[in-house]
């Protein structure tokens, strides 16, 4: 099975549009470094990879995941003022699905009191509000995959202790249908998983889960409708026999139906425990 690994004062050229940036990124070989440098100052090293990374940062300056303008200060991954607009989740959260709950003495949200998921636990980075929705939409539909560098690193910075306590063996991204991946040029869950995998030192198994059916848009469906929509949508790919604990990664957690469907497939394939991470989670309906 193939293991997948992730990669990021002089005058600045006029920035390209999202679609032009996406095309340029796709036509440029991925740098060998696992962690893109955090600044755009000229590299001290004469290494080819460092020089190329510096040149790319000059030609294609970072854009903010929230406002989509060139990031200030230069070298950061998000504008400080914009970062304050993101709703980072804080305790108390549901100990199963990861949603914020109001009562500090409660461990589960109302939904998880009624329904127990097959996965052990899910956590998320931010709440799915209008700001998060716009940012994730740009990632999925305008080629702004570089926004996931920020979200993946921030996920490990803020939730890394919890993720490490799960004693994960590998990360598996939730797959999109091949036709959608060809249209976008990437699977946003895979890119997010790659960034997190590099930060955590974990392998990413993209082929462990596959999608055979293009499901209908499900953002307005309830949990039962989503489960029906996802019926037979996924199947298991090659999975190492010694893989015991897996972190399933997706961009949005709504009802948990997608995570539940993927968990069911992984458990049937021999994985012992499945944990989940979502970039954003919707509030309880």
List the predicted regions and their residue ranges.
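Glycine-rich phosphate/pyrophosphate-handling loop used in enzymes and phosphotransfer proteins
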Residues: 1-250, 254-285
């Amino acid at each position: 099975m193939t293991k997948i690994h992730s990669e990021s004062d002089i005058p600045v050229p006029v920035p390209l549009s999202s679609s032009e940036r996406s095309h340029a990124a796709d036509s440029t070989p991925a740098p060998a470094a696992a962690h893109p440098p955090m600044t755009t100052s000229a590299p001290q090293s004469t290494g080819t990879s460092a020089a190329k990374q510096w040149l790319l940062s000059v030609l294609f300056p970072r854009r903010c995941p929230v406002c989509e303008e060139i990031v200030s200060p230069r070298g950061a991954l998000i504008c400080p003022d914009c970062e304050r607009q993101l709703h980072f989740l804080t305790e108390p959260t549901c100990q199963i699905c990861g949603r914020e709950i109001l009562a500090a003495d409660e461990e589960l949200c109302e939904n998880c009191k009624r329904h127990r998921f097959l996965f052990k636990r899910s956590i998320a980075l931010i709440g799915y509000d209008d700001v998060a929705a716009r940012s994730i939409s740009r990632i999925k539909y305008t080629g702004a995959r570089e926004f996931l560098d920020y979200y993946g690193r921030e996920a490990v910075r803020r939730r890394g202790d919890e993720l490490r306590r799960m004693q994960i063996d590998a990360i598996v991204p939730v797959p999109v249908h091949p036709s959608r991946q060809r249209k976008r040029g990437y699977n946003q869950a895979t890119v997010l998983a790659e960034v997190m995998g590099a930060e955590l030192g974990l392998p990413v198994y993209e082929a462990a889960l596959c999608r055979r059916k293009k499901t209908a848009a499900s953002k307005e469906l309830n949990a039962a409708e989503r489960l029906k929509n996802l019926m037979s949508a996924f199947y298991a790919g090659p999975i190492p026999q010694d893989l015991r604990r897996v972190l399933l990664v997706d961009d949005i957690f709504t009802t948990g139906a997608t995570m539940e469907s993927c968990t069911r497939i992984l458990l049937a394939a021999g994985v012992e425990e499945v944990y989940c991470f979502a970039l954003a989670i919707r509030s309880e309906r």
